[in-house]
């Protein structure tokens, strides 16, 4: 088999993490005699045999020496382009996968909710189809899952803006959930970030399907030239949405024939953001021919994901929730709405990507939050937003530098019967390896707390 994204006789893999290793295995299986290089700032612990290695500060300069350059998602196109020759072909594992995939691809993206929506869509579609594979940003590298796939295989692919930025294909079914400012340092601003997200629909044919929120004007604008059939979802009664909510019931509309699916408070995930995620996943199943019974069974079988409004434990009658994947203000705001007036303590803050924190002020003002436990560097911005929105309000502020310190402060300050929410509204990289590390440290610290405080 040949792949049009793998051109010439030499291949350079830029970035040798989990996805880079998957690309190496894939290329070697297709072209066992090819010249292959690996370029990475660091030296791989287990250097593969038979490949050239380029490391150090100038590792990208090696790009001009190869026919095809495969970048990992974390390496920006802007950084690579100055090092390409005129004949270089720059691609990615995502492009390679799309060019080679024999099955039906359901692509999911959005600033927030894509992991939950992808997982829920896969759970529901598994009740409809025999071979459903959840891959991409959420699971194992997508190239690992091509083996044994057929035209009937359904791939549910979570796609980040990094993966979409240079994508030359679009899924058969594209779900575009929402867009809010994120990764602005990587993309160079909000407009190029939106353009990257819009790539999920840019190459769709008239036979394809695009699923978006009916009332999201930004999504309408950036997909205005998309040729695909459109399906919408809405949290309100709507005559033009495939899936909508009325009187607390999710309803699907199939050509004017309306059928209730589930009560919103019976869903396995909570909060307004997760309601939208559920509606999008249900709409996808409807568009692909799922029955009412299959959709309902998929909803019943779904297990909520870690680090997304995850209940951890109760200590001294304080409920601790882990929302570590909340890396933007919108996510924290949704969490406050989802958990309601019982939230008394919020742990927030982290790496500063230049995202505006001022929307958090009104959200805190509308809440019953009393204690703000803040990590650098966005902790100060979050505090400023809270005070600017309600200067007379007396919050207790604690600046923290470790998760153990934050959890102990929450334990000391939060009233019995109330909630401590760890929802950072920021990236994790200033203190933690990633959002998983941050969430695991939170859970570990909570579980070490005494069940009851000593009198």
Regions found by a protein language model. Name each.
Residues 1-92, 392, 449:
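N-terminal leader/targeting and accessory segments in enzymes
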Residues 28, 60-66, 73, 77-214, ...:
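Phosphate-binding loop of NTP-binding sites
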Residues 2-10, 20-26, 131, 263-369:
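Nucleotide phosphate-binding/pyrophosphate-handling subdomain across enzymes
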Residues 36-41, 210-214, 345-348, 368-377:
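Short internal beta-strands
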Residues 37-40, 56-57, 91-96, 227-245, ...:
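Beta-strand->loop->alpha-helix junctions that form or flank phosphate-binding loops
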């Amino acid at each position: 088999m040949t792949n049009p994204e793998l051109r010439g006789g030499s291949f350079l893999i830029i970035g040798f993490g989990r996805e880079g290793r998957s690309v190496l295995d894939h290329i070697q299986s297709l072209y066992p005699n090819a010249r292959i290089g690996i370029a990475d700032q660091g030296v791989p612990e287990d250097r593969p045999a038979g490949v050239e290695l380029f490391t150090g500060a100038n590792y990208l300069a090696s790009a001009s020496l190869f026919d095809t350059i495969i970048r990992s998602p974390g390496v920006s196109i802007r950084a690579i382009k100055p090092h390409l020759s005129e004949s270089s072909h720059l691609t990615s594992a995502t492009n390679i996968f799309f060019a080679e995939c024999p099955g039906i691809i359901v692509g999911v993206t959005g600033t927030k909710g894509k992991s939950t929506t992808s997982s829920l869509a896969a759970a529901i579609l598994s009740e409809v189809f025999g071979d459903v594979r959840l891959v991409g940003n959420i699971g194992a590298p997508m190239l690992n899952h091509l083996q044994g796939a057929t035209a009937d295989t359904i791939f549910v692919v979570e796609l980040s803006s990094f993966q979409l930025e240079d994508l030359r294909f679009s899924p058969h079914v594209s779900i575009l959930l929402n867009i809010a400012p994120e990764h602005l340092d990587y993309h160079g601003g909000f407009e190029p970030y939106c353009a990257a997200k819009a790539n999920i629909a840019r190459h769709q044919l008239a036979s394809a399907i695009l699923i978006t929120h009916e009332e999201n004007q930004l999504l309408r604008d950036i997909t205005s030239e998309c040729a695909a059939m459109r399906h919408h979802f809405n949290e309100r009664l709507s005559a033009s949405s495939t899936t909508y909510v009325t009187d607390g019931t999710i309803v699907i509309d199939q050509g004017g024939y309306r059928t209730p699916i589930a009560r919103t408070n019976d869903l396995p995930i909570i909060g307004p953001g997760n309601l939208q995620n559920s509606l999008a996943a249900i709409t996808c199943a409807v568009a692909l021919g799922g029955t009412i019974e299959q959709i309902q069974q998929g909803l019943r079988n779904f297990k909520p994901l870690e680090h997304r409004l995850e209940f951890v434990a109760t200590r001294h009658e304080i409920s601790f929730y882990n929302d570590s994947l909340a890396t933007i203000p919108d996510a924290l705001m949704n969490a406050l709405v989802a958990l309601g007036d019982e939230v008394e303590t919020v742990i927030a803050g982290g790496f500063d990507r230049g995202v505006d924190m001022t929307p958090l002020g009104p959200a805190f003002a509308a809440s019953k939050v009393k204690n703000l436990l803040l990590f650098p560097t966005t902790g100060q911005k979050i505090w400023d937003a809270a005070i600017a929105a309600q200067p007379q309000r007396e919050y207790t502020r604690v600046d923290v530098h470790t998760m153990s310190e934050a959890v102990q402060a929450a334990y000391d300050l939060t009233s019995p019967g109330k909630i401590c929410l760890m929802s950072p509204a920021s990236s994790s990289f200033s203190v933690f390896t990633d959002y998983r590390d941050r969430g695991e440290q939170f859970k570990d610290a909570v579980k070490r707390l005494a069940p009851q405080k000593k009198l």
